[in-house]
Amino acid sequence: QPSVFNLVKWLANLHKAPLKPDQKLAMLKRHIIPKLHYGLQTPNITGQILSEADRLIRKAVRRVLHLSVHTGSQFLYAAIRDGGLGIPQLRYHIPDVLRRRLENLSRDDSLAKAMLASAGPAAEFRQRVSVLAARGPPQAYWREQVATRPFSRGLEDCAHDAASREWLLRTPAGWTGRDFVRAAQLRTGNLPTMGLPYIPRERRRCRAGCERVESVSHILQACPVTHFERIKRHDEIVRKIAAHCRKRGWTTEVEPRIYHQDGQLFIPDLAVHLAAESILVCDVQVCWEGHRTLAKSWQNKKLVYDHPRFRKAAARRWAGSRIAISPLVLGPVGVWPRSNAETAALLQLPKTIKGSCIQSCLKWGSSIHKIFMASVWKHGPRPAHHHQPRPPEGQATANTGTLQSGRPALSHSRKKRKRQLTPTQRAPSLASPPAGATPRQLIEY
């Protein structure tokens, strides 16, 4: 009779092992789960046993990667190519293996075909396997779930380029266990926010004072508190692309200022002078994929510069050169879409550069969320208002005299007055209680 007794012991040993989270995940996928396959492929297998094994494995994965219990199953069970973590779901994987094995036997062996066709234990086993595998191939089901569920929509683009999923197969050099866990939390929508569905609707507003729901997309892409961190993320990707182009021997201009004859200014991110008097104008953008796909964002980004006014201004700047316009769009959860293929071919981007850009998106996404959480925890929830992005650290604004922390910059006279306050004025709670106060009033005081 198959059981999950050994699985419980193996998972307990896994949690005790002095391994990093990515090593524990690899151990689970490459050793522990495959060891279960032989013992579970028996005539006595039931859906209840397989479901219990899946429950234990889900619990182990969530513990290793610090995932919420509300994490969608599509993140766990979808293949890495389809945007998931590649954990096999035994409840449907084992019956599908048995179904395909019985089909091969009935097709290749006449005796096995006769046994499966006649009444008896073999036919009953085949019928039970057909019921267990009624859903069909599990990977096709989870691929559809990733593409249609709200928190995972857009991850299906991981199938178009290996750079989007390389970090899950081989941990990048220099990454710590914390980096891997935070990247996995970002990919699976587990970074803590107030915009999760189980939080009451009236409490979902951004704690930085925005009139928006505090979702991961808002924090990483729109919140003014993280404005300058988003600029740093963008600039790091631009620097990596520019360094690659210079290494190829191409003259590369970063943020060239291109003026139209009527004074309109255009500042694309890169202008790469390719061979044979050809110039590629490339603008980089990190876009969230929701109702608007990354392919649509790529088209919109191209239209920003691919119009007669810019081409006329570029012709004045680089007379006699052929101008090609091709943007570069990435997803903040580490997605390199298919639409970037044209730009990657023109710039001859290798897999290492693509992977490095993906790693920048993931690590900066983690840093942006961390800075947002530190800000709201330090200053507390702010009233709703339309505030400006916070200035760089230590820099006071010209019109309000406020520092990055949001507190007013004290003038010399205010500092002097603050030093002259008495202890009672500084901390009113330290003053003496009123005479004749009752014991309850003393406690409340």
Curated annotation (Swiss-Prot):
Catalytic reaction annotation: DNA(n) + a 2'-deoxyribonucleoside 5'-triphosphate = DNA(n+1) + diphosphate
Residue numbers spanned by region Disordered: 380-445
Entry keyword NADP: no
Compositionally biased tracts (Basic residues): 380-389
Residue numbers spanned by region Nucleic acid-binding endonuclease: 115-445
Keywords tagged on the record: Endonuclease, Hydrolase, Nuclease, Nucleotidyltransferase, RNA-directed DNA polymerase, Transferase, Transposable element
Molecular function GO labels: endonuclease activity; RNA-directed DNA polymerase activity
Reverse transcriptase domain location: 1-114
Highest taxon above the source species: Eukaryota
Biased composition (Polar residues): 396-405
Statement: the UniProt record of this protein carries the keyword GTP-binding: no
EC number(s) on file: 2.7.7.49
Protein name, entry field: Retrovirus-related Pol polyprotein from type-1 retrotransposable element R2
Species in which this protein is naturally found: Popillia japonica
